[in-house]
From Swiss-Prot:
The gene is Ccdc54. Gene3D superfamilies: 1.10.287.1490. The modification Phosphothreonine is found at residue 182. Transmembrane segments: none annotated. Residues 178-214 are annotated as: Disordered. Keywords: Coiled coil, Phosphoprotein. InterPro entries: Ccdc54. Residues 86-149 form a coiled coil. It comes from Mus musculus (Mouse). It comes from the Eukaryota. Residues 178-191 have a biased composition (Polar residues). The lineage of its organism: Eukaryota, Metazoa, Chordata, Craniata, Vertebrata. This is Coiled-coil domain-containing protein 54.
Length: 329
């Protein structure tokens, strides 16, 4: 825009300058022609009288033409000065407009830079959000795979022949290790046990009744005690509860003279069973007889331990996982 205005101003100044210069040249040309004509006339008629008369007329014409020529030059200069002042004022206006437009362009550039910075920040935020979403998706898929794997692994362990063998081995190991810390006299155990514990045991068969009533049970050998313990363990049942959670904890309850509860993860069930299998199963040659009061004391401790474990398990299930029982064996 300002370039167009400068071009127009330059064109107008050039036109004014050429017009004034043309006028000056024309006036000078007229004077020169008059002088040349007068000189030629004086040479063609060389008389004194005419020369004097012509000299007077020439001097008068020159006196008349010089002020007019000077006046024309002066007017041309004034016009040129006015036009130059107009040009300068228009140029100053154009410069002001240029400055205004430049300020507007700078403001627009600043806004564009701010918008670009915001756009880059938003793109970075979007990329970080996408990365977070991808990581969350990966974690969710990992948790789902772990949950499915743990449940499948638990079911594989608990179901089928392998699970049954593990449960039977656990029963045998617990039955063989309990005479070290519990009473072995069937009469004292049954008489001192509470109704709940008695109800948890199945009723013994005829062979077991004979073995329990006979006084020779106190001096049994290893083979007879192991056989009786395995037979008794086969009739004792265990309750296994699986609680649905991401970690899939398992509660194992083994009933043998009291409630023993274990809380372990489904993925570590096999490790726990291997640890139990790796333990030594050495039995004492003669079972120990524990009095009635000692067994009552140990029974109270066992009840207190089971109450504490049950409270802990209830709080854990209340705040950490669901209370539904998926599988019960």
């Amino acid at each position: 825009m300002y370039r167009f205005h400068t071009k127009r101003v330059r064109a107008a100044a050039g036109q004014v300058w050429t017009a004034n210069l043309h006028k000056i040249r024309r006036s000078l040309k007229n004077v020169y022609q008059k002088c040349t004509t007068h000189h030629s006339y004086s040479t063609s008629y060389p008389t004194r009288a005419s020369y004097g008369c012509d000299g007077d007329t020439l001097s008068l014409n020159e006196d008349m033409n010089l002020p007019a020529m000077l006046q024309d030059i002066k007017t041309g200069q004034t016009e040129l000065l006015n036009q130059m002042t107009n040009i300068v004022s228009s140029i100053s206006n154009i410069q002001e407009k240029i400055n205004h437009y430049q300020n507007q362009m700078e403001a627009l550039e600043a806004r564009i830079n701010i918008s670009e910075d915001r756009q880059t920040a938003t793109t970075k935020d979007m990329l970080s959000m996408k990365e977070d979403i991808n990581t969350l998706k990966k974690k969710v898929t990992e948790l789902e795979s772990q949950n499915s794997y743990s449940s499948i692994h638990c079911l594989e362990v608990l179901e089928g022949q392998r699970g049954k063998e593990f449960v039977q081995l656990l029963h045998k190991l617990l039955q063989t290790e309990t005479p070290k810390g519990t009473a072995t006299s069937p009469d004292t155990v049954i008489s001192s046990a509470e109704p709940e514990r008695v109800s948890s045991y199945p009723e013994p068969t005829g062979e077991l009744k004979k073995k329990t009533t006979s006084p020779q049970n106190i001096t049994l050998k290893k083979n007879n005690s192991l056989q009786n313990a395995s037979v008794g363990c086969k009739k004792v049942r265990s309750n296994i509860y699986i609680y649905p959670d991401f970690s899939t904890w398992i509660k194992l309850t083994f009933v043998h003279g009291g409630n023993w509860r274990f809380f372990l993860s489904a993925t570590k069930l096999e490790e726990f069973i291997q640890w139990l299998l790796s333990r030594s199963t050495i039995l004492p040659e003669e079972p120990q007889i524990i009095p009635q009061r000692d067994y009552a004391f140990t029974g109270a401790i066992g009840r207190l331990a089971t109450i504490c474990l049950s409270l802990f398990h209830y709080v854990y299930c209340l705040f950490g996982s669901s209370k539904e029982e998926i599988t019960r064996l």
